[in-house]
Amino acid sequence: MRKGLWMLSLCFLALPIGAQNEKENGEKAKSVEMKEVTVEAARVTKKVDGLLIIPSAAQREASTDGYSLLAKLSLPRLRVDEVMRTVTPLMNDGSVQIRLNGTLASKEDLLSLDPKLVKNIDFIDNPGVRYGDGIGFVIDIRTKRNTTGYVFGADLSNSVTTVNGGNTLYAKYNHKNSELALTFTSLYKDQHGFRSSEVADYTLNNGCHYLVSRNQTDGRSRRFGNQFEIKYSLADSATYVFQANLSVGGGNTPGNYADFVYRDGTIEQTYRTINVSSDFSPTLDLYFFHQLGKHQSVTANVVGSSIYTDKRGYNGEGRTYAYDVDGRTWSLESEAIYENKLKPFTLSAGLEHSVSFTNNEYTGDVSALNKMRRGELYLFSEVKGRWKRIGYSAGVGVANKTYSQENYSFDYWTFRPKLTLNYDILTGLNARYTFETYRRVSSYAMVSDAKIRENSREWKVGNPNLQPSRVIKNIFDISYNGSRVSCGANIEYRRDLGSNMSVYERTPADEFLYSQQNIGNIMMFVVQNYVRYDVVPEHLSVTLFGGINRFFNISSLYRHYLTSYNYGGNIQAYLGRWTLTGYADNGWKYVEGEHEGRNGAAIYFGVSYRWSRCSLSLFMQHPFQQHPVIQRGKVLNENLYKTYSYRSRDLGNMITLKFSWKLSRGKSYKEIEKKVQNEGYKQTGIM
């Protein structure tokens, strides 16, 4: 298996050179004119920070919404699930940020998107300093907009083999420079097929090994949620844009429980765990853009939000353990950006400011009051341009971050330089190098001072003394984009110095306390490759990808290493009104701290038929699998060794029907492009 994967990697690395012979089709097609690299007949244009993708007419016609379109683009190193409505990196490469005409897009925005109005997609796999830490990919979908007319539509997705679905209704009305849009989404899930199993080996203080198994025998997982959004925008295509967006969302998980059998060789016990919650979150987003002459522009954005969360936890293993959480979070985020398109480069500079207040009160068997305040001021500047065959992007960001919680507080500065150089070797063949360093901050929840019991032996403990770690990245990639072949190889070496790593502390009472501490370094070396081939242009395309990953976790308490492999592929066929899709990957395996995990493999098949204003699709997930593994993992501590797995009968052979209907009328003009994003307010800080 390993030898085969190495051969696959070498083949991918060789493909860019061999693909240069592909000339006969390129001579007949027109070129795509861009300010970046121009590739004859290619629907993909290489940029310093990623790819500019122009979807084909067949892809637009065959897509029903934003997720459907993204799934057909075979984006490198991403898994797009249009049934579950998720976009996930194939490795731990940071989060994916999706935007619509520059503004951060919600699920509702993507579901109400008309693919036929999409002009291009800016796929950024190398985000600059103006994006927040931890953002690995940015997908900006740019569309046309109607000046007069209306749009009504519905996107209904419901599983027939299990209780799971999401239904969206939307409407837009345009008059001259104004647009009013309404969107309502209802999500539901009520499943009984989730099962977990666990075997733990505890080394006690007296040196004895205490073996325990916990196997789930029954359970129920429910989630009901609604989201309503109203958006007004006023835009003159040449000079200004104003947009106001008010959204209100909420959900609850009533009646969630799981029944287990506990065995330790002498005792067999049945017990139940309960985890129910409800949440409510209103958000107001105000945005303004103004064009100053031909080359300059200013952008401003303010987002205010609040999150109200009530949670109840119960664990019947051993003695009864129950607690409640009353959580409140308020946040305000603002950003301003200045951009000047000079020759031969573009200069951008700006500032971001955010402040949040969190008040989480734990009662019952957990007694804690977490009052946390976080603030950040971030200044950045970036230059991007071209000189002959060389494209470049250089930027620097400086941030002042503050945090306080009762007797704990810190105030520190971070420095984030980033440099990217891109060289055009030949037409369509590019090489790129990126260097970046920044400080990474732990999640809100892990810096609280709460202590939560996981089971009769284990506890999760927050650590308010956690300090930011230093991340250093060196990335090299080479890619080729031709008329029928696109391929590339990405090599990354990442170091996380002074990382917050997992620590298990054994108490005199033989309890095991999990926390995070700054005790070492985590390194990762990754090689990832992909190749896409249009077997029959506009009708049949095939994509293959593979990767080799090496992890190093070195701390003052332990050392863990891992080599893993991931591979997969997809196929798209456009046959008139019919569209056939298939996707498969083997999941991905990693080790971080003392936790080794493997996400389960994914297999999807889909067929859709479009007629007039309607489209009907059928999807099957995890075919021929009764209980597919969703995740496996291990705890590698010297005093606590554990293996666990999660399976789902509901996801096995899951069949989902999707119906889309759209009625529209109007004329289109230049798109709105909003360039500010805010998403830090989504953390609640609840453990």
For the regions a protein language model found, what residue spans apply to each?
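Short, acidic, small-residue-rich periplasmic hinge/interaction motif at the N-terminus
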Residues: N21-R60, V83-M84
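N-terminal periplasmic accessory domains that precede
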Residues: E36, G66-A71, R85-T88, E108, ...
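Extracytoplasmic beta-strand/coil segments of soluble accessory domains associated
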Residues: Y67-T103
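Short acidic/polar hinge/loop motifs at secondary-structure boundaries
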Residues: N101-G128
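Transmembrane beta-barrel wall of Gram-negative outer-membrane proteins
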Residues: V163-D190, N206-N256, F280-G293, G569
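Face-selective signature of the C-terminal outer-membrane beta-barrel domain
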Residues: G225-G251, I274-Y408, Y412-P417, D424-G428, ...
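Outer membrane beta-barrel strand-and-loop segments of large Gram-negative receptors
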Residues: S331-E335, Y378, N463, Q467, ...
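Outer-membrane beta-barrel signature, preferentially recognizing the C-terminal barrel domain
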Residues: F410, T427-L429, R439-G488, R495, ...
